[in-house]
Amino acid sequence: MLLAYTRLSHIHGNIDDSITLDHDTRKKARIKSTTDTGIDIGVFLERGHPLLVGEILKTECGKFIVVKGKAEDVATAIADDWLSFSKICYHLGNRHTSLQIGERWVRFKPDHVLEELAENYGLSINKTPAVFEPESGAYGKSGHNHGHSHSHED
C-alpha cells in the first residue's frame, strides 16, 4: 500500500498516477482508497485542509499522485442576468451551504428547497453530474499547502 503524508501544489517531474475523489472524500484528513491504476493508497493529512483538485500527493516511496475530482450529483443554478445571480448567491450564502461559484452560475449539493429557491429567482437548474469544488469560506485558507510535510516516524 502506498502511504502519502505530503501534499504539493506542483512538481517539476513526472506524475506517476492519479486518484479520483468526490468532494466529501477530499474533505477528509484520513483517506483509504485506490489510485486510478488500482494501487491501494492511504492518505494522512493535516485536518481542516481539504484536498484540492490538481494537488499532488507525494508518497513515502517517492511517487507523485495527482488528485482528480470525481463527477457527482450536483445542482447547478444558471442565471440569465447578474442581478438574479447576485440575489441567489446572497440567499444561498445566508443558508451557510457549500457553494461553487462561476460566471452567472452557482453549484451546490442537490437540495429541493435550494433548487426551488433558485427557480423562484428565475434561475434554471441543471442536474448534470459534475466535479464539485466549493469555495473555502470566509475564514478558510485557499487550501493550497505548498510543500507541507511532517514525519510519522518515531
UniProtKB/Swiss-Prot annotation:
Cell location: Cytoplasm
The segments labelled Disordered in the record are 134-154
What keywords tag this UniProt record?
A: Chaperone, Cytoplasm, Nickel
Q: Where is the composition biased (Basic residues)?
A: 143-154
One Pfam family this chain carries?
UreE_N
> Domain of life here?
Bacteria
- Which GO cellular component terms are attached? cytoplasm
GO BP term, pick one: protein-containing complex assembly
* SUPFAM superfamilies, per the entry: Urease metallochaperone UreE, C-terminal domain, Urease metallochaperone UreE, N-terminal domain
Entry's Gene Ontology molecular function annotations: nickel cation binding; unfolded protein binding
| InterPro entries linked | UreE, UreE_C_dom, UreE_N, UreE_N_sf
Q: Where is the signal peptide?
A: none
Q: What is its main location?
A: cytoplasm
**What role does this protein play?**
Involved in urease metallocenter assembly. Binds nickel. Probably functions as a nickel donor during metallocenter assembly.
Q: Which family is it part of?
A: Belongs to the UreE family.
What name goes with this protein? Urease accessory protein UreE
Native organism? Alteromonas mediterranea (strain DSM 17117 / CIP 110805 / LMG 28347 / Deep ecotype)
